[in-house]
Amino acid sequence: MKIVIADDHAVVRTGFSMILNFQEDMEVVATAADGGEAYQKVMEHKPDVLIMDLSMPPGESGLIATSKISESFPETKILILTMYDDEEYLFHVLRNGAKGYILKNAPDEQLLLAVRTVYKGETYVDMKLTTSLVNEFVNHKHSDDVSTNDPFKILSKRELEILPLIAKGYGNKDIAEKLFVSVKTVEAHKTHIMTKLDLKSKPELVEYALKKKLLDF
């Protein structure tokens, strides 16, 4: 099978490439340092599996790239590689098209099992995350209700400018410089956005921005 690895750390890309290329049934055909490059490599090589870090530089995070790649190249199975052993992140990446979720500290045997599992079209979740959580997600995956009273309509013009920048991974300082405002102003708007939209975490904000088509790729 053909594999692409996307991670912003060169040592991770090199280490995982060595592990996978040692297997007779696996070949790493390309690597990428961010989500945008991952998209280009997938488009170029049409790999069977994309192993992608969830946290990469601003602009093309793993979560955003997952949604984009899974929609454009459904034949490529995405395995998320991350440090987050939090079911909240798991739910978001599965909802956005990933087929697997594995922690960076997982043993080599588990990584190989994960790759082979998603290659077959099956879902793989790191052993540290329980089966009950996955079952709960599957049962409620298609039950999202769309509210008739959309809080999006009450966001201010400035909040509408800041929301997609946060979702793309820009930090408060970067946003402040981009919009010529203070960091404290950005922090205040960020708090207002989370409150108005009833969002509890950044992954929820990213998913919301994707649903509202606020992100340009």
Curated annotation (Swiss-Prot):
Species the sequence originates in: Staphylococcus haemolyticus (strain JCSC1435)
Gene Ontology molecular function: any one: DNA binding
Residue ranges: DNA binding: 172-191
GO CC annotations on file: cytoplasm
Annotated Response regulatory domain residues: 2-119
Localization per Swiss-Prot or TrEMBL: Cytoplasm
Main location: cytoplasm
InterPro entries, alphabetized: CheY-like_superfamily (IPR011006), Sig_transdc_resp-reg_C-effctor (IPR016032), Sig_transdc_resp-reg_receiver (IPR001789), Tscrpt_reg_LuxR_C (IPR000792), WalR-like (IPR039420)
Keywords for the protein's UniProt record, in alphabetical order: Activator, Cytoplasm, DNA-binding, Phosphoprotein, Transcription, Transcription regulation, Two-component regulatory system
PTM annotation: Phosphorylated by NreB.
GO BP term, example: phosphorelay signal transduction system
Function summary: Member of the two-component regulatory system NreB/NreC involved in the control of dissimilatory nitrate/nitrite reduction in response to oxygen. Phosphorylated NreC binds to a GC-rich palindromic sequence at the promoters of the nitrate (narGHJI) and nitrite (nir) reductase operons, as well as the putative nitrate transporter gene narT, and activates their expression.
Protein's name according to its UniProt entry: Oxygen regulatory protein NreC
Modified positions (4-aspartylphosphate) in chain numbering: 53
HTH luxR-type domain segment(s): 148-213
SUPFAM superfamilies given in the database record: C-terminal effector domain of the bipartite response regulators (SSF46894), CheY-like (SSF52172)
